[in-house]
Amino acid sequence: MLVLAIETSCDETAAALVDGGRRILSSVVSSQVAIHAEYGGVVPEIASRKHLEMISPVISQALAEAGVSFGDIQGVAVTRGPGLSGALLVGLSAAKAIACARGIPFVGVHHIEGHLFAPFLERPVEFPFLALVVSGGHTHLYLVEGFGRYRTLGRTLDDAAGEAFDKSAKIMGLPYPGGARIDAMAQEGSPGAIRLPRPLLADGGLNFSFSGLKTAMLNRITKHPVSIPGAEANDLCASFQQAVCDVLVAKTAAALERTGVTRLVVAGGVACNSGLRRSMQALASGLSIDLRIPAPALCGDNAAMLAVPGNHYLEQGHASELSMDVTATWDMDRVGEGRS
């Protein structure tokens, strides 16, 4: 099935053409990072207006790069939620319009569900598998037993890992988004140079908390300002990044032990982080498990990842109704209700 996938949950307008839920014919992403950098974070109203401006050009570009027309599309997959309501509505409206005009089915997909299956665009993963999804808004551990069959094992109790990266970067005076900048500076620093907390590291549970680490960064910068560029700033970035990675790895290792699964997916925007990729590779090597981390282009928000579960649901006859609305909050444990 040739699926047009559309993603507009936050600040990327994306469209992709994927054949059979596996072969990417095109994947176009229009980022708003430069626009929101002026405000130090995503402004929902501005994001929605930019999506309205870019949705048609992005879809047209995806079709052109794939060498197909609207008449070739057999189904549409679109992010229904979670995300910014106004932003989601732009993508959903476009998907409904195309599906209605062409007389083809469409399906609303959970944004995180897309991240879970991003590795399938490179090589399928056998069920069951453990998934760690780390991004600006999510830090969750899931047991994935099949399409639509997800069990949340752990989640952030406050800030997500990506949010902690961006807020800590802002505290240091680094430009938005700061996660990539911290990663780059960390490679020039010493991860053991500055002592920082590892929240909930030894609590015995699988939940995460990064607000305390963020506060520790604020206190450190307040008492000991650093010059950028500079060796001390690099050390602080390296120490912060190592603290985050230590927590993520420890919780993931505990989840692997509890579930007994031998396959691990690490996905989401923070999965681009070089320190996290190295740490997870070391964990996988030590435990002899099958680790899948998508290529960086598939870690950040994109539309192609939505086509994997979208294609499955459409082929199973689980299309969405035109009356379906966006949902800004959506529990992953309930995604499979009414379909599988």
UniProtKB/Swiss-Prot annotation:
Write out the similarity annotation. Answer: Belongs to the KAE1 / TsaD family.
Keywords of the record: Acyltransferase, Cytoplasm, Iron, Metal-binding, Transferase, tRNA processing
Q: Which cofactor does it need?
A: Fe(2+)
Q: Where in the cell is it found?
A: Cytoplasm
Q: Which HAMAP family match?
A: TsaD
Enzyme class per UniProt:
transferase
Task: Keyword check for DNA damage, yes or no.
Answer: no
Annotated Gene Ontology MF terms?
iron ion binding; N(6)-L-threonylcarbamoyladenine synthase activity
Family annotation (PANTHER family): TRNA N6-ADENOSINE THREONYLCARBAMOYLTRANSFERASE, TRNA N6-ADENOSINE THREONYLCARBAMOYLTRANSFERASE, MITOCHONDRIAL
Identify the domain of life. Bacteria
The organism that produces this protein has a lineage beginning with: Bacteria, Pseudomonadati, Thermodesulfobacteriota, Desulfuromonadia, Desulfuromonadales
GO BP annotations, alphabetical order: tRNA threonylcarbamoyladenosine modification
User: Which gene holds the coding sequence for this protein?
Assistant: tsaD
UniProt protein name: tRNA N6-adenosine threonylcarbamoyltransferase
Annotated residues that bind substrate are located at 133-137, 166, 179, 183, 273
Q: What does this protein do?
A: Required for the formation of a threonylcarbamoyl group on adenosine at position 37 (t(6)A37) in tRNAs that read codons beginning with adenine. Is involved in the transfer of the threonylcarbamoyl moiety of threonylcarbamoyl-AMP (TC-AMP) to the N6 group of A37, together with TsaE and TsaB. TsaD likely plays a direct catalytic role in this reaction.
Query: Which reaction equation describes what this protein catalyses?
Result: L-threonylcarbamoyladenylate + adenosine(37) in tRNA = N(6)-L-threonylcarbamoyladenosine(37) in tRNA + AMP + H(+)
Recorded GO cellular component terms are: cytoplasm
As recorded in UniProt, its EC number(s) are: 2.3.1.234
Work out whether the entry's keyword set contains Isomerase.
Answer: no
The residues listed in the UniProt record as binding Fe cation, with positions renumbered to this chain, are: 111, 115, 301
The protein's predominant localisation is cytoplasm
Under InterPro entries, the record lists: ATPase_NBD (IPR043129), Gcp-like_dom (IPR000905), KAE1/TsaD (IPR017861), TsaD (IPR022450)
